[in-house]
């Protein structure tokens, strides 16, 4: 999965989608 963290300008690939303001797809 790709998680876009609003606190980071670079997307990170993770198996677990964190809760919060992150956008995962």
UniProtKB/Swiss-Prot annotation:
GO terms for molecular function: acetylcholine receptor inhibitor activity; ion channel regulator activity; toxin activity. InterPro entries: Snake_toxin-like_sf. Disulfide bonds join 3-24. Residues 1-15 have a biased composition (Polar residues). The keyword Disulfide bond applies. It is found in: Secreted. The keyword Disulfide bond applies. This is Alpha-elapitoxin-Bf1b. Belongs to the three-finger toxin family. Short-chain subfamily. Type I alpha-neurotoxin sub-subfamily. Transmembrane segments: none annotated. SUPFAM superfamilies: Snake toxin-like. Residues 1-25 are annotated as: Disordered. Keywords: Acetylcholine receptor inhibiting toxin, Disulfide bond, Ion channel impairing toxin, Neurotoxin, Postsynaptic neurotoxin, Secreted, Toxin. Expressed by the venom gland. Binds to muscle nicotinic acetylcholine receptor (nAChR) and inhibit acetylcholine from binding to the receptor, thereby impairing neuromuscular transmission. Coiled coil: none annotated. It comes from the Eukaryota. One of its GO terms (cellular component) is extracellular region. Its main location: secreted.
């Amino acid at each position: 999965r790709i998680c876009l963290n609003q606190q980071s300008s670079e997307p990170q690939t993770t198996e677990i989608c964190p809760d919060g303001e992150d956008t995962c797809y």
